[in-house]
């Protein structure tokens, strides 16, 4: 009885204060159909494919939006790789790097009618390696993918806040 009463009170509090999940504001700003484009870096073409897939997946799973062609889209998101760096974080007793942090700098541009939002976001991902080992290609790609996902999540959060601010106007 106490559990159901507490749940009922919490439900009333959330409904009466007008609470909306932040994704609702991003959905409203983005629209139903979104065109996505990721600039392919000639030095790292695999990363563009991973980022485009991650962006499309994020739009479909987090915002429940469909990816469409440019002419049918309500809005567009463009992503450009600016910089990819690996920074040593920790060394062992012999001076070998045992922990790295990947810094993936992405430039995002969101366009919808007259609204144009540009944002430079750095996604970071920490990962260990064996002492005296070089960063393997698989580990490198995984770190870039995870760092890109973190940057995408941050950009979606930014769109939610932007949608909230536009909704209040």
Q: Which stretches of residues belong to each language-model region?
A:
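A structural "domain/chain start" motif
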Residues: 4, 14-60, 161-169
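C-terminal/domain-edge helix-coil "capping" segments
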Residues: 112, 131-169
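Surface-exposed short loop/turn segments
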Residues: 66, 76-142
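Extracytoplasmic/periplasmic, Sec-exported soluble proteins
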Residues: 43, 47, 51, 98-100, ...
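N-terminal, post-signal-peptide region of Sec/Tat-exported proteins
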Residues: 51-78, 82-84
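Sec-dependent signal peptide recognition
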Residues: 2-9
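Short coil/turn motifs at beta-sheet boundaries
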Residues: 27-31, 72, 95-101
